[in-house]
Design a protein with these regions (language model features):
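The conserved cystathionine-beta-synthase
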Residues: 10-29, 36-37, 54, 74-94, ...
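Short beta->alpha transition motifs characteristic of CBS
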Residues: 27, 34, 41-55, 98, ...
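N-terminal glycine-rich phosphate-binding loop and ensuing alpha1 helix
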Residues: 124-189, 352
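Catalytic-core segments of class I nucleotidyltransferases/pyrophosphorylases
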Residues: 228-229, 236, 242-249, 262-265, ...
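A short, conserved acidic/glycine-rich loop-to-beta-strand motif
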Residues: 251-261
Length: 355
């Protein structure tokens, strides 16, 4: 059957792998694709399906046919009226809705913008009011010479600063209380925030010497009694952090790391050798996939007790300490295009060019 271009652009073959499908979603700026197998409709695959597969340690090169989960999906039939379909799409916040005929074949697809005037999918999810700790005290040396003049939190991104973009994202999901660790050019950061028309609920705390990537959080002992977010001041994610919190709670984690799925293609043939230098295997221009740390976390309040007061202590030290005592450190993956590292010149320039 011939489909319109906008439907064809959303179709992915069931033989595509998890990592290939993540890239297709990134390139198409979409979180849902329509899966076909040998010309027949199989189902919808979402970004959330791929994230759950990665969390479950399903290999990145697994075909998505093994990942499609129709038990959690709802599809419309040609006999359903538009008001019913509209209600379903609102309930699921669905980007698109397949319309199936009596034999289960794809007849049409209704997109969000076909039914709603606002292109932005309505957010009817429950808000979460968790504390947010922002690590804003670093020197931002990777952005020199700009950060010789202004601190990294105040580096502009469009009409806002990096700091405002990060805080606005958390406020958007219901978080209102911010604890901000400051050190380098602290007075400038405080003054700027005090002059904003929008007043954030911020408590500042300041280390009197460098304490590593998490050491200053020891100063918050006794002040935070619920799970809380920690964010570096250069990490912008397009991920809804409520999904991360849901995973953190359901997986009974002590600490959850938001990771980014990153692929590296080696432009050479890679040779594996054994004893006496004999070749064991050859991979021609292999693509390697890893999860890398984005600098955003959820911590249980008990983690604060693990951070030694007044000592230099990295978040990686906290991860190891938590694991050593038998705690759970989880990883929640986001796609490569979902994360922007604003602390690195190339990524920063790429973003402001888009804006």
């Amino acid at each position: 059957m011939e489909y319109s271009k906008r439907i064809q652009d959303k179709i992915v073959d069931s033989g595509k792998t998890i990592i290939q499908t993540m890239k297709l979603m990134d390139d198409g700026f979409t979180k849902s694709l329509i899966v076909f197998n040998n010309g027949r409709f199989v189902g919808i695959i979402t970004n959330g399906d791929l994230q759950r597969a990665i969390i479950a340690k399903i290999p990145f090169d697994t075909p998505i046919l093994k990942v499609v989960d129709n038990k959690t999906k709802r599809y419309a039939s040609v006999t359903d009226d538009r008001e019913k379909i509209k209600t379903w799409m609102l309930e699921k916040r669905a980007e698109l809705m397949p319309i199936l005929d009596e034999e289960g074949n794809l007849s049409d697809v209704i997109f969000w913008k076909d039914l709603f005037s606002d292109d932005k999918i309505e957010d009817n999810r429950k808000k979460i009011d968790l504390p947010v700790v922002i690590m804003a005290g670093g020197k931002g040396t990777r952005l020199n010479p700009l950060t010789n003049v202004i601190p990294k939190p105040l580096v502009p991104v469009g009409e806002k600063t990096i700091l405002e973009v990060i805080m606005d994202q958390f406020e958007g999901i219901g978080c209102h209380k911010f604890y901000m660790s400051v050190n380098y050019k602290a007075d400038m950061v405080k003054y700027y925030l005090s002059q904003l028309e929008h007043k954030y609920d911020i408590e500042f705390f300041q280390e009197d010497k460098p304490l590593g990537t998490i050491g200053s959080v020891s100063l918050l002992k006794g002040r935070i009694t619920t799970p809380f977010f920690v964010s570096n001041c250069d990490s912008i994610n397009e991920q809804d952090y409520r999904d991360v919190y849901d995973y953190h709670v359901s997986n009974h984690n002590d600490l959850t790391i938001v990771t980014m799925v990153k692929s590296f293609k080696i432009p050479y043939g890679v040779i594996e050798t054994g004893e006496d230098g004999l070749m064991v295997a050859l991979s021609e221009k292999p693509e390697l996939t890893y999860q890398v740390n984005t600098g955003v976390y959820i911590l249980n309040p008990s983690c604060i007790e693990e951070i030694p007061k007044g000592e230099f202590f990295h978040i990686t030290d906290l991860m190891e300490k938590t694991k050593t005592r038998g705690g759970r450190v989880g990883c929640f993956p986001v796609s490569e295009h979902a994360w922007k590292d604003m602390g690195e010149w190339r990524e920063y320039l790429k973003l402001i060019k888009v804006l």
